[in-house]
A protein has these predicted regions:
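N-terminal glycine/serine-rich phosphate-binding loop of ATP-dependent small-molecule kinases
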Residues: 1-84, 129-131, 136-159, 172-190, ...
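Short beta-strand segments
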Residues: 68, 85-89, 123-125, 161, ...
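Active-site phosphate-binding/coordination module
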Residues: 83-133, 190-194
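N-terminal, positively charged, Ser/Thr/Ala/Gly-biased leader segments
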Residues: 188-203
């Protein structure tokens, strides 16, 4: 049966296919070309199989499709995620803005705070103690009013992060049910996204998940719809930690380095075959550039900062910047002003 490996970048999509007889085929096409096709990955598969755009993919002849994608990465770098509402314990509304109070430039008087991903924050009247016992009962009516207002204002994604909810998730579960009844498209709860102590890391990661999961889910659904005729084709996505997961389990918090992580695994395997055990990887795409290091074993981090955003999730140790082959360097008068990814 056919097998496909696809790297969907911000500018180009690369496809490697193996025919049933073992022959390897490769193809490359633009990730965005609305006049020619809806999705580059599906278009590439059809092109390799000599199908027309309107033809259905014979999924009974395809064993698996394994993908890495920078959809979430580029959405974060370019701040194109979904509008998000943050619900947090009363008294902690500014917690994620304050963060850990890190100041890279200690004596700089003009402090540049990182851009927040959430549009709005609501402090919820509720409180648990460190053992998970209720100190203050949840005010459900307050939450219902806040959620209705956010929904009416066009916000469709909600992040819920309460104090000590990793011990007792009852309050978060109640809020999640209310948000579900209000038909929010994405509901991220901290005790599921990052069930660990420390509200800053848990809250940051939950917001990232709520911000990116909708755009990621739309893309995954777009691909899976073309491959679900008889459900015989296995669709899997590369996670930031370098492992593959089923398409239905692919989350925003695990997708930030989906594409780059696949590059690290490929670099290491290629390097080993060539007899090298120490490697530095430089991966420049059209939208972003990734740099990584290997000295005998994969380097991973659990808490990291990407594009000015803190996140607590296992991922490959990769440094990413929003500057690629298609980036635009602006020039005014006698100085270069800024470099940004193309739109």
């Amino acid at each position: 049966m056919w097998q496909f490996w696809i790297d969907r970048g911000g500018t180009f999509t690369d496809i490697v296919a193996r025919k049933p007889d073992g022959t390897i085929l490769i193809d490359k096409l633009l990730s965005e070309n609305v006049s020619m096709y809806k999705d580059a990955a599906i278009a590439g598969i059809k092109r390799i199989l000599n199908l027309k755009n309107e033809d259905k993919i014979p999924t009974d002849k395809i064993a698996s499709v394994k993908m890495g994608t920078t959809v979430a990465t580029n959405a974060l770098l370019e701040r194109k995620g979904d509008r998000t509402l943050l619900l947090i314990t009363k008294g902690f509304g500014d917690l994620l803005r304050i963060g850990y109070q890190n100041r890279p430039l200690l004596f700089d008087l003009n402090i540049q705070l990182p851009e927040l991903l959430y549009d709005r924050v609501v402090e919820v009247s509720e409180r648990l103690d460190a053992q998970g016992k209720i100190v203050k009962k949840l005010d459900e009516n307050q939450v219902k009013i806040a959620l209705k207002k956010a929904k009416n204002d066009g916000i469709n994604s909600v992040a819920i992060a309460f104090m000590h909810s990793y011990i007792n998730p009852d309050h978060e579960n109640v809020i999640a049910k209310i948000a579900e009844n209000e038909n929010f498209d994405q509901i991220s709860v901290s005790h599921k996204v990052s069930p660990l102590i420390k509200l800053v890391g848990r809250g940051d990661t939950t917001v990232v998940d709520a911000y990116l999961s909708p755009i990621l889910r739309r893309y995954v659904n777009q691909v899976s719809e073309e491959l679900e005729e008889d459900k015989s084709t296995k669709l899997m996505f590369m996670q930031s930690n370098g492992g593959l997961t089923d398409a239905n389990l692919f989350q925003g918090k695990d997708a930030l380095l989906s594409g780059p992580a696949g590059g690290v695994v490929s670099m290491v395997q290629t390097g080993k075959q060539a007899g090298y055990g120490k490697l530095i990887g430089f991966d420049m795409g059209g939208t972003s550039t990734d740099v990584c290091h290997f000295a005998g074993e994969y380097e991973r981090s659990f808490e990291t900062e990407l594009a000015g955003v803190r996140i607590r999730a296992p991922m490959m140790q990769i440094n990413t910047v929003a500057a690629g082959g298609g980036s635009i360097l602006s020039f005014k008068a006698v100085s270069y002003t800024h470099l940004r990814a193309h739109e």
